[in-house]
C-alpha cells in the first residue's frame, strides 16, 4: 500500500534526491510507493482515513501483523492546522508543528512566530520537544519549554525528545508543574476532536 507523506516542498525535494529509486519510473520491484502531499503552512489540510486498506499492528512477542480494515462508517477527514516553526534561532530551517482539533504536536521546533501562537489558542493538549535544561542550538531549553507551555495555556502539556541530559522520569515529574509531563513511548493523548 502507498504511504502518504505530508511535507513542505523542500522536504519533497530532499526525498526525491536521497531516495530517487522510490520515484523512478518504471517502478523497481520492492521499492516504496510514496504519495507526496505538499503542505503550505498558510493553509489547513484535510487528511482522509485509509480504513479501506489493511493495517499493520505490533503484537508483543510476535511482531507486526496484518489486520483487515475496520468495518463501519469511514471517519470524517481530520482538519490539520500546520504551525510554522523554525529548527534554529533564525528562520533558515523551516519545520512544521501541527494542531489536530484540541491537540497540538510540535517537535524539533526551536521557536514559532505570533501567528503560530494564534493557531494554538484554545488547544487543550500540547507537546513540545526539549533535549536538555540548557540552551540548545535547535531545541528550546527546559525553561523556554515551560514558558511556551505557560503562554499556550493548555490543560495538559507534554515534553518529548527527552535525552539522557534530563533527570530520570520520576525525578523529572517531581520538578515539573502539575500540568506538565514528560512524554513516554505509547502515550495516548485524549481529546474529543
Q: What positions do the PLM features span?
A:
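Binuclear metal-dependent hydrolase catalytic cores
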Residues: 1-105, 171-193
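Short beta->alpha junction loops/turns
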Residues: 8, 88, 109, 162-165
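Active-site-proximal loop/helix segments of hydrolase catalytic cores
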Residues: 91-96, 100-129
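Binuclear metal-ion centers of metallo-dependent hydrolases, dominated by the metallo-beta-lactamase
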Residues: 113-193
Amino acid at each position: 500500500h502507498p504511504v502518504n507523506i505530508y511535507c513542505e516542498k523542500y522536504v519533497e525535494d530532499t526525498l526525491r534526491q536521497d531516495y530517487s529509486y522510490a520515484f523512478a519510473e518504471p517502478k523497481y520491484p520492492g521499492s516504496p510507493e510514496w504519495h507526496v502531499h505538499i503542505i503550505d503552512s498558510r493553509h489547513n489540510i484535510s487528511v482522509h482515513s485509509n480504513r479501506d486498506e489493511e493495517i499493520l499492528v505490533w503484537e508483543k512477542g510476535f511482531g507486526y501483523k496484518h489486520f483487515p480494515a475496520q468495518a463501519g462508517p469511514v471517519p470524517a477527514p481530520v482538519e490539520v492546522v500546520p504551525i510554522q516553526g523554525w529548527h534554529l534561532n533564525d528562520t533558515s530551517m523551516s519545520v512544521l508543528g501541527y494542531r489536530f482539533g484540541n491537540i497540538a504536536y510540535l517537535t524539533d521546533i526551536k521557536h514559532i512566530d505570533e501567528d503560530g501562537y494564534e493557531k494554538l489558542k484554545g488547544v487543550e493538549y500540547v507537546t513540545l520537544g526539549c533535549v536538555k535544561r540548557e540552551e540548545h542550538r535547535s531545541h528550546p531549553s527546559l525553561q523556554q519549554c515551560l514558558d511556551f507551555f505557560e503562554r499556550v495555556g493548555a490543560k495538559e502539556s507534554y515534553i518529548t525528545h527527552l535525552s539522557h541530559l534530563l533527570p530520570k522520569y520520576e525525578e523529572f515529574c517531581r520538578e515539573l508543574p502539575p500540568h506538565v509531563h514528560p512524554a513516554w513511548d505509547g502515550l495516548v493523548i485524549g481529546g474529543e476532536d
